[in-house]
Swiss-Prot record:
Residues 1035-1051, 1117-1134 have a biased composition (Polar residues). It is found in: Cell membrane; Cytoplasmic vesicle, Phagosome membrane. Phosphorylation of Tyr-1021, within the YXXL motif, is thought to initiate phagosomal formation. This is Cell death abnormality protein 1. It comes from Caenorhabditis briggsae. Residues 113-148, 156-191, 199-233, 246-276, 553-587 form the EGF-like domain. FU repeats lie at residues 629-682.
Length: 1134
């Protein structure tokens, strides 16, 4: 019998090697593997957890089984099937909970492949990294909870936490913070305006404007005053000024106006707004802005500034007139008698020339003393003490003695020596007495002899001087080259003769000593020096045969006419003036009221001039009429009042130029046609508005702030309250959807992210996102679909990345590539990135490409067939490429990949099948032999039918079992619980505290992740054999490969249910009670020795050690097959 069991075990093992994977057993190294996979490093927590586990529980069952007995029925071989009852012990796993301490990543962290704990952010950070659970640290330029939004305007940096430091409305780079300047500005903070030759963002574009013009932010030229044209190339014409040269100049007295602002540029001698006033006394020059630099209260020329010195001379009138001079620049000579004498007591007034006598003198020539020569005093009663012979004069008023030269002393009684001089003759004269005759007693100056000069008379006379002290100038009339120093005789030049060269050469002679004869026509002399003919007035040429051209006159026509407004006589140069002019040079216009030739005619104009030629009155600005006696009417001005002013608020205008004299508060300009410039108000626009940024300037008259739409308040500093907008916040906002707001300026609904429309009720269309859906999705896929709030791209199936521009990586598919492909590895298949469908490589098939092509097929989708007669010696049919040589590298590669993928599982080879067939045949022979000898043994040992021996207390829990471990039987629960007193029969629920099979399988699914129960059982109750065999045992149970289902039977295959031996050993020592069988007539005692049969425990040790996988299903309890009954009876006693 042991031999038969061994053969059965071997057969089962061989069957499983050929057709099934090795069963899975509990991993004894699981705890070690768990330790290896435990997280390490930071953020690791140790937690106590409750884990599910199973414990074995023995269950005692009431069973009904079939047996065979000898009977008289020959049709059944004298063996009849009878039903018998008994007890059976089985073991069932019970789910229990146990405490266990494990290491795992702390809450908010997840374990990586290298067993580190990293923070978990869900949803994941888009443009940043997860630094804490649920907290993203955004890359520069991005913000939001998951870093999916670009920084808003005015912020930048990590988490958009920094504010842009820019001016003039500039934004900054969201990553670097660099200011992005608007058009017209540059600099690190956009604080600088563009240079005059640049414009645009960061001032990189060249400005074509000329002459100081600048480009505005659109690149158009803004010209300076005085220029116009597209590029400011056109200068204002004379008489025009201002912007676009649209204003007329109205300057007088020949003044010009500035083409930029219209200011009159007066000629010298005039001033005033229109240059209509002559310079005041003491001022001169253009605009009379220069002050005369004359001293002593003297005036200057209003045009040149030259001092008009009367009674004074010098550039600044700083020198008084010399004795005997008076008048302008002291040019006039006094006519007072006696002034020609040095000692005259007369003088004249420097300004008027009136003669005056010094004090103490009288007479027409002031040469008469009031007192006698030797008396003085008011009444001439005092006697002079002077030596009158040595005295020039005794002062008539003081009696002071004025000594003659060469005398000194109080009374002039002493004479100076030859070489002394000065007051009291105290100074010594330094003369060369060889050439000096005497020294001046007054100043000690040496008096040189003729032909000598110099301080001490040691130098000869210069070339043009002669006589004592060389004081006399040679009188050669400019016709000689110096003279003799002693007597002054001239050295005459050619053409002259005489002591003083006072005589010309005689007629018709010229040259040195007048020795040459002239070669000129009769009556025409020649130059006494050169001999050239000297033409008479009005003629020119070498021979004096050409008349003077117009504009010249005189001898040889060398003189130029000075006639300004006329012609001159070619001989005399006398001017013949044009009408309206007079004077020697015709430069004098007719005086006011005169006109015609020589200004002889008179005109009768009222306070105006008349034409010098025609006598027609020329009215000044502001006058009109034939005689210019009528003033301009209101709103007219200019010459003859022909110009009209534009209607304005001006109270009165200047009739000369139309400029408003007094503009009302709030206006400016020539005609008060302009409001005050932005930001100013009041009279002369002198006050500045005090309005905030929300103001659009102020009222030019009152200064009251004019608020921009959306603002209100005295200074326009307050925004409109909620629900209001527009000017003065007078308009009501529309009903915007919840979550949106009304713009305080325009009244438009300001939609939040994801909404658009007039009232923010319409979600963003495809391809748009953000506030008001103004942002365009940056996704590159053809769908352009992104999150309406954040702009995050919603990638279609098959794409991923921030912009959905990256295809799914291998092994992933679907929207955003978040689904993992179920294909069995990349070696056997590729996964469709859109649908996830596995696309099998050649040689593989199945939904997940997990199987090789069936035998005799190969290629893509296993669509090709191998040759029916084989590939030939040394060749095989590869599942991928078909027939190939076994030594070819790629031959058999698909099979290798399949085996590697399935852990080495492969189809059984032909040798395995031969071994199986051999074992089956051997088992058949041994089985027949065993059956023959068994029947023979039974007949010889005990011809009677056996009885079953039960314990005397069969209802005791520990004795509810059969003691024959080899008996084939079905374990069955009573219908309503075998141990609760309910009715018996059928399969019922598990006793209290135990799990039913369904509950057990359900708990097993919870632990092991769903799917089929890991027990892989199809019978009602687990036996100890199955528990010992691991978690499930073999997947198949018959040679036909048909899996048994619960409540089904496949042929004659049976499931031996082995009784447990976990009961106490004392149970084996108890006696057994004979229980009569229902169909027997006599009771027999069957005494079975404990050492003559297997206990269940010994059998399990023996049987399971030889074959841990052995498991043969129990038969269906309803089968009443005689063969089964007979086999059961035979097995009972084997």
């Amino acid at each position: 019998m042991r031999l038969l069991l061994l053969v059965g075990v071997l057969l089962a093992a061989t069957w499983q090697v050929g057709y099934t994977r090795a069963p899975t057993f509990p991993d004894k190294s699981k705890s070690a593997a768990d330790a290896i996979n435990e997280p390490k490093g930071e953020h690791v927590c140790t937690v106590k957890t409750i884990v599910d586990d199973y414990e074995l529980r023995k269950v005692i069952h009431q069973v009904v089984y079939n047996d065979t007995e000898q009977c008289l029925n020959p049709l059944t071989g004298f063996q009849c099937v009878v039903e018998k009852r008994g007890q059976k012990a089985s073991y069932q796993r019970q789910l229990v909970q146990k405490e266990k301490y494990i290491k795992q990543c702390c809450e908010g962290y997840y374990q990586t492949k290298d067993n580190q704990c990293q923070p978990d952010c869900n949803p994941p950070c888009k443009k940043g990294k997860c630094v804490e659970p649920g907290k993203c640290e955004c890359d520069p330029g991005f913000g939001g909870k998951i870093c999916s939004s670009s920084c808003s305007i005015g912020t930048w940096g990590l988490g958009c936490s920094k504010k842009c430091d820019c001016e003039n409305g500039a934004n900054c780079d969201p990553e670097l913070g660099d200011c992005i300047c608007p058009s017209g500005f540059q600099g690190k903070r956009c604080e600088e305006e563009c240079p005059i030759d640049k414009w645009g963002p960061n001032c990189v574009k060249s400005c074509p404007c000329q002459n100081g013009g600048k480009c505005n932010h659109e690149g158009k030229c803004v010209c300076t005053d005085g220029w116009g044209g597209e590029y400011c190339l056109n200068k204002c014409e004379e008489g025009k000024f201002g912007a676009d040269c649209k204003f007329e100049c109205t300057c007088q007295n020949g003044a010009t106006c500035d083409n930029t602002n219209g200011k009159c540029l007066c000629k010298s001698g005039f001033h005033g707004a229109l240059c209509e006033k002559p310079c005041s006394e003491g001022f001169f020059g253009a605009g009379c802005t220069q002050k005369c630099q004359c001293l002593n209260n003297q005036d200057c020329d209003s045009e040149t500034g030259e001092c008009k010195c009367i009674g004074w001379t010098g550039k600044q009138c700083d020198i008084g007139c010399a004795r005997g001079r008076f008048g302008l620049q002291c040019k006039q000579k006094c006519t007072c008698p006696g002034l020609e004498f040095q000692d005259s007591n007369a003088s004249c007034d420097a300004k008027t020339g009136e003669c005056q006598c010094e004090s103490g003198y009288k007479g027409a020539n002031c040469d008469e003393r009031k007192c006698s020569a030797d008396t003085y005093g008011a009444d001439c009663s005092k006697q002079c003490s002077c030596v009158m012979s040595n005295t020039v004069m005794c002062a008539p008023n003081t009696g002071f003695c004025r000594c003659k030269p060469g005398f000194y002393g109080d009374n002039c009684e002493l004479a100076c020596s030859k070489d002394s001089y000065g007051p009291n003759c105290e100074k010594q004269a330094m003369c060369d007495w060889t050439h000096a005759s005497e020294a001046d007693p007054a100043n000690g100056k040496c008096v040189c002899k003729s032909g000598r000069s110099g301080a001490n008379c040691s130098q000869p006379c210069p070339i043009d001087f002669y006589g004592p002290n060389c004081a006399l100038q040679c009188e050669c009339n400019g016709r000689g080259i110096g003279c003799h120093g002693f007597d002054g005789k001239c050295n005459c030049a050619p053409g002259y003769t005489g002591h003083r060269c006072e005589h010309h050469c005689p007629a018709l002679t010229f040259g040195a000593n007048c020795e040459k004869r002239c070669q000129c026509p009769a009556g025409v002399g020649c130059n006494p020096i050169t001999g050239e003919c000297e033409c008479p007035a009005g003629r020119q040429g070498l021979k004096c045969d050409i008349s003077c051209p117009e504009g010249s006159y005189g001898p040889e026509c060398k003189l130029h006419c000075k006639c300004v407004n006329g012609k001159c006589d070619p001989e005399t140069g006398e001017c013949s003036c044009e009408p309206g002019f007079g004077g020697a040079d015709c430069s004098t216009s007719c005086p006011k009221g005169k006109y015609g030739d020589a200004c002889e005619l008179s005109c009768d104009c009222s306070d105006s001039y008349c034409s010098r030629q025609t006598g027609k009155c020329i009215c000044p600005l502001g006058k009109k009429g034939t005689l210019c006696d009528q003033p301009c009417e209101a709103n007219t001005y200019g010459p003859q009042c022909q110009l009209t002013t534009t209607p304005s608020q001006c109270a009165s205008t200047d009739p000369r130029n139309g400029v408003c004299l007094t503009c009302p508060p709030g206006s400016s300009g020539h005609q008060c046609e302009q409001n005050c410039p932005q930001g100013t108000y009041g009279t002369d626009c002198a006050s500045k508005c005090a309005c905030a940024d929300g103001g659009h300037g102020c009222d030019p008259t009152t200064g009251e702030c004019i608020c921009e739409p959306g603002y209100h308040g005295a200074t326009c500093s307050e925004k409109c309250p909620d629900g209001k907008f527009g000017y003065a916040c007078a308009q009501n906002c529309p009903k915007c959807a919840a979550g949106s707001s009304c713009d305080h300026i325009s009244g438009q609904c300001v939609c939040p992210a994801g909404l658009e429309g007039a009232t923010c009720t319409r979600p963003c269309g495809v391809g748009f996102w953000g506030n008001g859906c103004r942002q365009v999705c940056r996704c590159t896929s053809e769908f352009k679909q992104c999150n309406a709030q954040t702009g995050e791209c919603s990638c279609p199936a098959g794409f991923q990345g921030d912009r959905c521009d990256k295809p799914c990586e291998d092994g992933y598919y679907g929207p955003d590539c978040i689904k993992k492909c179920k294909c069995q590895g990349t070696a056997t298949a590729s996964c469709n990135r859109v649908t996830g469908v596995c696309i099998c490589h050649p040689g593989f098939t199945g939904e997940f490409c997990h199987a090789l092509c069936p035998e005799s097929t190969f290629g893509l989708r296993c669509s090709k067939e191998c040759p029916k007669d084989g590939c030939g010696d040394g060749y095989e049919c590869d599942a991928a490429i078909g027939c190939c040589h076994v030594d070819q590298m790629s031959c058999g590669k698909a099979k290798q990949e399949f085996e590697a993928l399935n852990g080495g599982r492969a189809k059984s080879s032909g040798a395995t099948w031969l071994l199986i067939l051999f074992i089956i045949g051997l088992c058949g022979v041994l089985g027949l032999a065993a059956l023959f000898y068994r029947n023979k043994y039974q007949k010889e040992k005990d011809p009677d039918m056996p009885t079953v021996s039960f314990h005397k207390s069969p209802n005791a829990e520990d004795n509810r079992e059969f003691q024959n471990p080899l008996y084939n039987r079905q374990s069955v629960f009573p219908d309503s619980g075998a141990f609760s007193g309910s009715s018996e029969g059928g399969v019922g629920a598990a006793p209290d505290g135990l799990l039913t099979l369904e509950e057990e399988d359900l708990e097993d699914k919870k632990i092991h992740g769903g799917g089929a129960s890991r027990n892989m059982r199809n019978h009602d109750y687990a036996s100890l054999d199955e528990v010992a065999g691991g978690e499930g045992g073999p997947a198949t149970s018959s040679s036909s490969g048909v899996q048994n289902r619960r409540g089904q039977n496949s042929g004659d295959v049976r499931r031996p249910l082995l009784n447990s031996e976990d009961v106490d050993d004392d149970d084996e020592d108890e006696d057994f009670e004979e229980i009569p069988h229902e169909n027997r007539n006599s009771t027999q005692k069957l005494s079975l020795e404990r050492n003559s049969k297997f206990s269940e425990k010994n059998f399990k040790k023996k049987f399971l050690s030889e074959n841990p996988y052995a498991h043969i299903p129990s038969p269906d309890p309803n089968i009443q097959n005689s063969t089964n009954s007979r086999r059961a009876q035979e097995n009972l006693y084997t």
